[in-house]
Amino acid sequence: MEARPCSGVIFTDLDNTLVGPGGEAGEAGEVYLEALDLGYRVVPVTSKSIYEIVELWDSIGVPPGERIALAESGGAIYGPRGSLARPTGFNSEVGLEYTALGKPLASIDALLDSLAETCGAVRLSKADATEAQLITGLPRERAALAARREYLEVIWSRSQECLDTILSTALRYRELTYVHRAPRTVQIAAHRGKGMAIDAALQEPLLRPCAKVVVTAGDSSHDIPIIERGMLAFRVDYNRDWSRLVKPIYMVIPYEAPKAWTMLIETVKTRSNTPSL
């Protein structure tokens, strides 16, 4: 697949950055398509599974040739057939080839089981429909898509003490290279996370021509590896903890999604007409 002329690339978080709390893109969906028309490639970088991302793309109407994503917090890069330099395989269900950027959950399955069993926690990848809804807070069908994990496990418990125990135990294992504590879960994987995934993606033939302008956006401290890689970086800010943000150069968007992403594209359009960008 030949890379089309490219104005730049936008690496963006999804939840609370491009899509609102209900999981809908709304007006941001139209702006997503506008960004494509402007010559940008838009690459979601998210903890979501590829099946959730494809559902979002379908709802927006993203063309098949523009479907590129870093799924499960950087576990794999997905793109159209023929777009990746050294694909690991082809997912016929979603019609995309992929390159694994770490080990699949199957390779650390026993270890993940032992962590969850420490205090009766639940693995999202093994959750039933009711548990998946409880863990994700999503409607039943979307929760089922979220549970289809291949590279990032989400372990849930009602007990904060349980989650703290799982976190401290997981950090002792060298093979678990991605361990993050969220308010209600612990996310665990055998890959290097969002930032390293972006670095790898920019080496792909599909995105290499876009690297002259790299735009990034995120809404939480977990998105710092995304934000810090942007030449034009956006922080969707509403009472978030940004104490770990090292890179001081970013623009604050004082709106929630999906309006936040609309403002992002308007700013990109304005800045793209200046010599500095």
From Swiss-Prot:
UniProt keyword Endoplasmic reticulum present: no
* Broad class of where this protein is predominantly found: cytoplasm
Keyword terms, alphabetized: Cytoplasm, Hydrolase, Magnesium, Metal-binding
Cofactors, names only: Mg(2+)
Q: In which pathway does it act?
A: Carbohydrate biosynthesis; 2-(alpha-D-mannosyl)-D-glycerate biosynthesis; 2-(alpha-D-mannosyl)-D-glycerate from GDP-alpha-D-mannose (MPG route): step 2/2
Query: Where along the chain is the active site annotated?
Result: D13 (nucleophile)
Q: Where in the cell is it found?
A: Cytoplasm
One GO biological-process annotation of the entry reads:
mannosylglycerate biosynthetic process
- Which reaction(s) does the protein catalyse, per the Swiss-Prot or TrEMBL entry? 2-O-(alpha-D-mannosyl)-3-phosphoglycerate + H2O = (2R)-2-O-(alpha-D-mannosyl)-glycerate + phosphate
Q: Does the keyword Cytoplasm apply?
A: yes
Q: Which GO terms describe its cellular component?
A: cytoplasm
GO MF annotations in UniProt: mannosyl-3-phosphoglycerate phosphatase activity; metal ion binding
Role this protein plays: Hydrolyzes mannosyl-3-phosphoglycerate (MPG) to form the osmolyte mannosylglycerate (MG).
> Could you identify this protein by its name?
Mannosyl-3-phosphoglycerate phosphatase
Organism listed in the record: Aeropyrum pernix (strain ATCC 700893 / DSM 11879 / JCM 9820 / NBRC 100138 / K1)
Gene label: mngB
